[in-house]
């Protein structure tokens, strides 16, 4: 018998680290002029139309088995991984689908790109939900559609955040895939075999958002753009780092050191972003990960306090110094002198 997961308690447990649903200023996006690099969009659109993964997400016989042999804690952590991944993919589907609908008259090229990206995200979410079904559970995507809460971002911020989200998704998937190709004994479930082609969807989506950013030079070329790029790089990296610090046991179960994994993903994503953003973070500065480690410890302590049976007022007093320390460490990271990536935009990596 399959149990449907509706996440009715989500509003009570939602944090800054929870996958979110976004909306934006559709009129501003509709008025964008993409003539600066229109040929790039035609090339990307042809890539999307080719639909290289149309036959990739097909479940084979290897899925038709019992997963009761998985250790209980590992199974629980893996299901949570599937749920979070499915929610994130579904969030992307809803945003891209709405953008394609709103832009189809004013900017048909961009609208079709969003439509085809929504196809990919829906495919990913459906594949993940089928995997959840192997554990007699199902994420209620219809319920999510009806009850989702939107976070508003202006188009510029949507571009920064989603570009980084797609690129970091690429590096997360390909890093896990390569690890499991080398150590197949850690492949606890066949979905990991799909990550090589899967991550190429993420990479193409990231390239699309890179083209959008380049089509609007003012999103990249002034001092405010540099400040915002630093902010979004730090936000995306810190969110992943703090999330994964809570899930060390899951990464251990698939043979990965979560800290080393995150460091690799952050370095690679930072390198990718340096080809688009005017600045990159100095992730090789020893203080960078030192401060991130402190943030992760602060966040873990905050979670531990929430698990205690103390009175709300007592918890508030216990949390206050931890929040202050976490915020201070994030500010310290932000203030580390960034790398001027504009100076190396023509460097071949």
Curated annotation (Swiss-Prot):
It catalyses: Mg-protoporphyrin IX 13-monomethyl ester + 3 NADPH + 3 O2 + 2 H(+) = 3,8-divinyl protochlorophyllide a + 3 NADP(+) + 5 H2O. Pathway: Porphyrin-containing compound metabolism; chlorophyll biosynthesis (light-independent). GO terms for cellular component: chloroplast. InterPro entries: AcsF, Ferritin-like_SF, Rr_diiron-bd_dom. Its EC number is 1.14.13.81. Its cofactor is Fe cation. One of its GO terms (biological process) is light-independent chlorophyll biosynthetic process. It is found in: Plastid, Chloroplast. The keyword Mitochondrion does not apply. GO terms for molecular function: iron ion binding; magnesium-protoporphyrin IX monomethyl ester (oxidative) cyclase activity. Its main location: plastid. Keywords: Chlorophyll biosynthesis, Chloroplast, Iron, Metal-binding, NADP, Oxidoreductase, Photosynthesis, Plastid. NCBIfam families: AcsF (TIGR02029), PRK13654.1 (NF010172). Belongs to the AcsF family. Catalyzes the formation of the isocyclic ring in chlorophyll biosynthesis. Mediates the cyclase reaction, which results in the formation of divinylprotochlorophyllide (Pchlide) characteristic of all chlorophylls from magnesium-protoporphyrin IX 13-monomethyl ester (MgPMME). This is Magnesium-protoporphyrin IX monomethyl ester [oxidative] cyclase. The lineage of its organism: Eukaryota, Rhodophyta, Bangiophyceae, Bangiales, Bangiaceae.
């Amino acid at each position: 018998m399959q149990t449907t997961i509706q996440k009715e308690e989500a509003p009570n447990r939602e944090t800054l680290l929870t996958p979110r649903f976004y909306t934006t200023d559709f009129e501003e996006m509709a008025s964008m002029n993409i003539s600066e690099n229109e040929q790039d969009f035609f090339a990307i659109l042809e890539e999307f139309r080719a639909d290289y993964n149309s036959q990739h997400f097909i479940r084979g016989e290897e899925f038709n088995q019992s997963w009761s042999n998985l250790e209980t804690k590992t199974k629980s952590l893996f299901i949570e991984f599937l749920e979070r991944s499915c929610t994130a993919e579904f969030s992307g589907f809803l945003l891209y689908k709405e953008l394609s609908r709103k832009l189809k008259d004013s900017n048909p090229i961009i609208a079709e790109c969003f439509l085809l990206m929504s196809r990919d995200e829906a495919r990913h979410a459906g594949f993940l939900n089928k995997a959840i079904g192997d554990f007699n559970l199902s994420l209620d995507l219809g319920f999510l559609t009806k009850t989702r809460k939107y976070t508003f971002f202006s188009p510029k911020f949507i571009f920064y955040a989603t570009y980084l989200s797609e690129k970091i998704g690429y590096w997360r998937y390909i890093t896990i895939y390569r690890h499991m190709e080398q150590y197949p004994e850690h492949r606890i479930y066949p979905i990991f075999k799909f990550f090589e082609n899967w991550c190429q969807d993420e990479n193409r989506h990231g390239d699309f958002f890179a083209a959008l950013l380049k089509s609007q030079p003012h999103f990249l070329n002034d001092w405010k753009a540099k400040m915002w790029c630093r902010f979004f790089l730090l936000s995306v990296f810190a969110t992943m780092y703090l999330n994964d610090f809570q899930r060390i046991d899951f990464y251990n179960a698939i043979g990965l050191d979560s800290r080393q994994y995150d460091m690799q993903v952050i370095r690679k994503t930072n390198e990718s972003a340096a080809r688009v953003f005017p600045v990159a973070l100095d992730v090789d500065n020893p203080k960078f990960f030192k401060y991130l480690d402190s943030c992760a410890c602060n966040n873990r302590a905050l979670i531990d306090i929430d698990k205690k049976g103390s009175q709300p007022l007592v918890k508030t007093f216990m949390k206050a110094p931890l929040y202050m320390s976490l915020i201070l460490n994030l500010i310290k990271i932000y203030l580390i002198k960034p790398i001027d990536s504009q100076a190396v935009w023509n460097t071949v990596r």
